[in-house]
Amino acid sequence: MMCSNNISDYKLLEILKNGMIGTVYKAEDINNKCLAVKKVSMDQPMEKLTLLFNEVLTVRRLQHRNINTIVSCFLYKQYVYLTYKFMCFGNCEVLLKNVYTSGFPEVAIALILKDVLSALTYIHSEHYVHGSVRAKHILLSPRKAVLSNFSYCQSFISQGEKKTFIFGSTVGIEKELYWTAPEVLYQNLSGYTEKIDIYSIGITCCEMANGFQPFKDTELTYMYIEKVRGSLQVLLDKNSLLENQGSLSLEHTNKRIARDVIVNKSFSENFHQFVELCLNKNPLSRWAASKLMTHSFLKQCRNTSLLDQLKDLGQKMSKFKRNEHEIFSDARGSHNPQPNDTIWKF
């Protein structure tokens, strides 16, 4: 897919997201084709720009249908512009807040995870760790899910040699820690491997199935203690309720979930087992991404597709109004810079 490196060839239609580093717009190119354009100011702390450069350099090396590939990247005046293929359903976190408020259907989760695991299998085979898997970083279209946000991606290759372990933190902001594996939180000399992404998959399963992030509204210290102890997050359904003798008080939120919401849910035993495998405290006992793709939980993907499962999503999305952090209705036509030559591209 060829894409122009001249900002005057794009019409920025509306703001999709105001992120930590930049703003993402829905845009059209000169052929009226929709795409996403990320606009990043160079006038910000170097640590944020380093995250941007890390993402660009990493994604340029990775080519996979389930990775949110950068189509082009260029500089105009004091802004860096990155263009991506447009994923019309946005990210899974926004969908949880506005459409699937009680969680995604299990079959939809299986289809989404199949694509994400395919991306992780490839990423790990290229000796990288994504380091930030969560619903917010999974984008959807009618035909596929893609993994995005490679700002915290790390490589096992250093100075031409492959390391066995990675040391240090993969996350730079507090709110990402809820999805982080315990071995990263330890910050000890043992380091960690690509299995931290598998743990994050387990947390993301709970997030997408239950309708909210695990450990929501709890202190970081409590979350840290629970993970170090090996306390498992669970899929909340009638089976969870029965196992807890009819009363399930959630340790990871200050609010009690309505009992009738839980009793009306029933996840398969395969799904429960899949999550337990991902959230094993011992990283050596977690399955690799490639092995998880053979798990019985994903067999339900065989006779359906994302297109089948999400066919009514467009209509559902039209019924909710996104807040100011997700879309600005007055953004149309007001964000285009004046035409000029591109200074550089990479």
From Swiss-Prot:
Residues 10-298 form the Protein kinase domain. It holds the Pfam family Pkinase. Keywords: ATP-binding, Nucleotide-binding. SUPFAM superfamilies: Protein kinase-like (PK-like). ATP binds at residues 16-24, 38. InterPro entries: Kinase-like_dom_sf, Prot_kinase_dom, STRAD_A/B-like. GO terms for biological process: positive regulation of TORC1 signaling. One of its GO terms (molecular function) is ATP binding. It comes from the Eukaryota. One of its GO terms (cellular component) is nucleus. PANTHER family: SERINE/THREONINE-PROTEIN KINASE FRAY2 (PTHR48014), SERINE_THREONINE-PROTEIN KINASE FRAY2 (PTHR48014:SF21). The protein kinase domain is predicted to be catalytically inactive. This is STE20-related kinase adapter protein stlk. The lineage of its organism: Eukaryota, Metazoa, Ecdysozoa, Arthropoda, Hexapoda.
